[in-house]
Design a protein with these regions (language model features):
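Tandem CBS (Cystathionine beta-synthase) repeat/Bateman regulatory domains
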Residues: 1-170
């Protein structure tokens, strides 16, 4: 049975999702009352057509990271470790809360010193509602999408979800 919360394909008859531990009993599965709710529960994150993320490795200098963000007009960078696996995320919020307060020499600092390590992630085939729930619970503006190996392959922003909901309401 496919979990309506995270999209994981569980064994038939399972009472609880092996991935997210949500109940799979019919009484606990929410039912959609509107087309928007149905879309959030059934449409995959991939329907947002997430953009390819800009990535840097953990040893990139903060000066270089800031320049990339400014030149590409983006609000975040995904930070990768060896083998390309996602190690963290550097957002505008990180810059304001961590870097701006300390005002270190940016050429000498590395992104790994200021990134948010081990960020929440989703996969392109997860239900949109699951991604939205992760963003709300964790107070995120950006949600990295990863493949089965943990390598980033997309990013979804709160603006993407708002645009999707607005489009489906009209």
């Amino acid at each position: 049975m496919k979990c309506p919360f995270c999209g994981y394909d569980n064994l038939p008859g399972a009472d609880q999702c092996e991935q997210c531990l949500s109940s799979l009993t019919q009484d606990d599965i929410p039912q959609a009352d509107s087309g928007v709710e149905r879309s959030l529960m059934e449409d995959p994150v991939a329907c947002l057509q997430p953009i390819r993320p800009l990535t840097v490795d953990t040893h990139t200098s903060m000066a270089e990271a800031l320049e990339l963000m400014r030149n590409h007009h983006i609000g975040c960078l995904l930070i990768t470790a060896e083998q390309g696996a996602l190690a963290g995320i550097m957002t505008e919020r990180d810059l304001l809360q961590k870097v701006a307060l300390e005002a270190p020499p940016l050429e000498q600092c590395r992104v790994e010193d200021f990134m948010s390590a081990a960020p929440e992630t989703s996969k392109p085939d997860h239900p949109l509602g699951y991604a939205l729930q992760r963003m709300i619970v964790s107070d995120l503006r950006y949600l990295p999408l990863v493949d089965d190996s943990g390598r980033p392959n997309g990013i979804v922003s709160s603006r993407d979800i708002i645009a999707y909901i607005a489009k489906n309401l009209i």
